[in-house]
Amino acid sequence: MDLRAMNSGVSGLLAEQQALGVVGDNIANVNTVGYKAERAIFEDVLGHSILAGTSSGLPGAGVAIGAIKQNYTQGSLNTTGVSTDVALSGDGFFVANGSVDGITGNFYTRAGQFTLDKDGYLVNPTGLKIQGYSANGDGTYSASLSSIQAPTTSIQPRATTAATVTANLDSTATPPTNAWGDTNTTFASQSNFSTTQTVYDTLGNAHTMDLYFRNTGTGTYDWHAVMDGTDTNSTGSLTFGTNGALTGATGTTVDFAPTGADPMTIALNFGTPVAAGAASVAGSMTSFASSSNVSSQSQDGYASGDFSGISIDGQGVVTGLYTNGQKLAISQMGVAKFRSNDGLGRAGDSLWIDTRDSGPAAMGTAASGGRGSVSSGSVESSNVDLATEFVSLIQHQRSFSANSKTITTADEMLQELINIKR
């Protein structure tokens, strides 16, 4: 009697058992961040070698699991609100460098549950360092990958050297009767309008700079600078054309000697003067027949600041945040892309490695070259569909039972054959 049926049944049991393990692995990882569901690929087994010219009616010898493939479709994004949590929307993998089971090098992950370690490195839960392109400080980034490290030390203060004021000065304002510098009257009574900015010295101390503007009644406004309530004797004038556009500016620096710090010279920028009759340039002072008001003002100084954390934008740019409100670019996260994701090898801990089948990693940045964008404060959920997995459980259970029935039937037939001799 041919025992092929029994062998086929055994192969079916083994294959279904292995497939059931795949389903169980999926269900177990339903809450694993960045996990990609697996599926078992069944292949038939021939009882003979394939030879040229043989009959197409070769007998089968059961079934085997030919491969276990992962499904790399996008998982849903789960908002966490944690600034170091990131997710990729689209193709690609974050790059993590370190050692896993004695293998040292780059590993690839979709699980963006990152943190800053004690040395400021951005790391995954197992301590692998996330790779990126370091910021050069001039808006460009290095050409090679390195570990992303936040400079957790304090940022040094920067003295104010330039300040910008954009405002409208009412052309119909009545010139004040009190003269500049009259010690018996206030600065406010000597002017029509004023602005206030906080500026910083070389030690990072804050100072209040008040600019007072006085209409002369001749298409000109004089300005006067006061620092911390004390007259700096820094003055100048702004002239305006008949259309209200700025046509000239004089005396555009403020000099101040703070106690214990280096003397300060602040260059004032009131905008770009134009020729008489020309239209005003955006961002310049104006003098129209409307109430005086400031539209914008800024200065380039700041106090010292302590590191307070990082932010990550949609292109993976990692920015250091400081308590003084400053932001400094640190790095841009590297994103790896492969010719065939199916060829990647699993390394555990939500990591993959490149193989000959996947091809080498093509390094780049988020939202470029077909790579996905980065979502900060979110993680990518597992793409396991529980409903599908439960259906697969039932299918594999039924198939397992059917294969066991094949074995018992073949056994009964063999027993009948043995009984013939009796």
Where on the chain are the PLM-derived regions?
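Small/polar low-complexity and glycine-rich loop motifs
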Residues: K36-D385, F390-S392, S399
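Amphipathic alpha-helical coiled-coil segments
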Residues: L13-E16, L20, L386, L393, ...
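Register-specific recognition of a single heptad position within extended alpha-helical repeats
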Residues: R4-N7, L14, P59, A387, ...
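Structured functional modules or segments
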Residues: M413-R422
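Acidic/polar, glycine-anchored loop/turn motif associated with catalytic or activation segments
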Residues: N403
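N-terminal intrinsically disordered, low-complexity, charge/repeat-rich segments that act as generic
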Residues: M1-R39
